């Protein structure tokens, strides 16, 4: 069922970390979780045009720290930081504690799954063909270093009456491999025909540690210092001849000595002579000649 499960939840505590990092008792957990959901919905609506990839919420003692990962940090900050100050006040009012807002820039939005899905949905709402939008996003992702990408759109594609699902994949997307860094994102396009859902999987490489970005590569090439010097070639080693080719075999020696033909001229093989140093016996077979005809023409019996 690796194709069905959420790739982010499948890799939590293995190669991924949580998007909300705080601890609460059983009595306070539900209320704090509801606050997190409201904050994320508010930021999604408020920063719709800021290309927000994800939101990280941390809660130290009687405080809150929210990190916004965006491809357009200038839109979030606003002129002279006015927008971000208003954002802090609103978030502090919702959470009831002082809030610190940090902005992190997404360097490559073309390989971020959430931003790819949002870009495709915006194009679908502008009545652009879904196949063209999907293939263009795949080409940009592979060009900027993604090892594989898969995009799936489902709904009333092109306004058809019966909803269907269509997906494209390029490269490899190992969903069952836990160490694989799979970035997963979804988005919805609200069209006149209904809602079209878009899912994106991006394979960025293998990771060893737990975090948001790919860690050390498992198949990284060793450095020059780690490489051991190679020995001489086989045909250049002193005191050794060049080895025979793999396919050639040496002739097999007889196990019990040499076999000789019988002296009586029969077809039966003679018994092996004991020892390989025994002298070889040569047997010459003589064919009986027919009697010559008489000189006077008479037959001889």
From Swiss-Prot:
UniProt biased composition (Basic and acidic residues): 224-244
A Gene Ontology BP annotation from the UniProt entry: translation
Superkingdom in the source lineage: Bacteria
Keywords assigned by UniProt, alphabetized: Ribonucleoprotein, Ribosomal protein, RNA-binding, rRNA-binding
Quaternary context: Part of the 30S ribosomal subunit. Forms a tight complex with proteins S10 and S14.
Record-linked HAMAP family: Ribosomal_uS3_B
Family (UniProt): Belongs to the universal ribosomal protein uS3 family.
PANTHER family for the chain: 30S/40S RIBOSOMAL PROTEIN S3, SMALL RIBOSOMAL SUBUNIT PROTEIN US3C
Record protein name field: Small ribosomal subunit protein uS3
